[in-house]
């Protein structure tokens, strides 16, 4: 474990380019050793437990409670500075192995971030920032998303141990893709001048028992398994195989990368890890506002906020207790992930899960944050996005196939 701003640890004044690789659904404890050994890793708390809110946070440096992007139909107010093209700055976003049933310009991250479309690494010139959003170990495990729909997949493949192994195999597969891109940068003569970052938008539940109730997948609830993700920095001079002390947030990614290339950071919720050291008692936030359309109306089935330090945190459940509990029951018995959940959700898990989903406050780990401090920090009300669009029937069907809606 080492301490200090990344710039001091690397001995470098900065980089010309940035390459960010987002491996979807990759938990901190599933980070392949091949990635960890190449750079400096810090445990990171995702800003949200699913893509719709976490990708906007990664790219903007703002918590969901600031940018108000909760669902896939919501939009950031403007393109984030990290991805804003300027005369002397090329920005690209590529998800060629994700969202395979969508046209490039209609892919959810492209729309949420207000981009015009995707760009390939070969199409951009230095100086640049290039972001790859990879499928990673996202369900359905072991298959591309254009081959299997999540629901039918889990009816065919529902052995918990086999699924957990497939998940880890997909993490390794995602690492291979990342390393292939590093080789491309090397062959193009760009590796030495590029800060490379391997991270994830959120984690994944793999049938954990106790209060998590044997649940699979992501989106809900707020818990360490869905929020603790890796952030590994790789580049010239950056220590290899080391862990950076403290806790980071997904909202630190944008300011850190902008600082490393000497760009203006602007107003963000995160800190600049390139030039700053996280405080030992740092607290970071996470939020989720999961909505579901049923019976001709929109239901806030899971709304929550969390406050975390390096040892745990508190979760504040908002809105209807009955809706939360009902949504948990739906997930484990009727939802796309129900087949494996039936194997990991016994009576004790069901009772524990219902109790957790029903409580207003829940403590995780050995956090030094008191309940009173959490209540004060999370006393604000969450606000709906002012900029949303209606998804087409085809878009909704594609998102349903991926288990999102």
Curated annotation (Swiss-Prot):
Q: In which pathway does it act?
A: Protein modification; protein glycosylation; Cell surface structure biogenesis; S-layer biogenesis
Give residues annotated as binding Ca(2+): 24, 201-202
Record keywords, A-Z: Calcium, Metal-binding, Transferase
Q: Which cofactor does it need?
A: Ca(2+)
Q: Does the keyword Transferase apply?
A: yes
How are cofactors bound according to the entry's free-text note?
Binds 1 Ca(2+) ion per subunit.
InterPro entries (alphabetical): Alkaline_phosphatase_core_sf, Sulfatase, Sulfatase_N
Which cysteines does the record link by disulfide bonds? none
Family to which this protein belongs: Belongs to the sulfatase family.
* Role this protein plays: Involved in N-glycan biosynthetic pathway that takes place under low-salt conditions (1.75 M instead of 3.4 M). Participates in the formation of the tetrasaccharide present at 'Asn-532' of S-layer glycoprotein Csg, consisting of a sulfated hexose, 2 hexoses and rhamnose. Mediates sulfation of sugar 1 in the tetrasaccharide.
Q: What is this protein called?
A: Low-salt glycan biosynthesis sulfotransferase Agl7
Which species is this UniProt entry from?
A: Haloferax volcanii (strain ATCC 29605 / DSM 3757 / JCM 8879 / NBRC 14742 / NCIMB 2012 / VKM B-1768 / DS2) (Halobacterium volcanii)
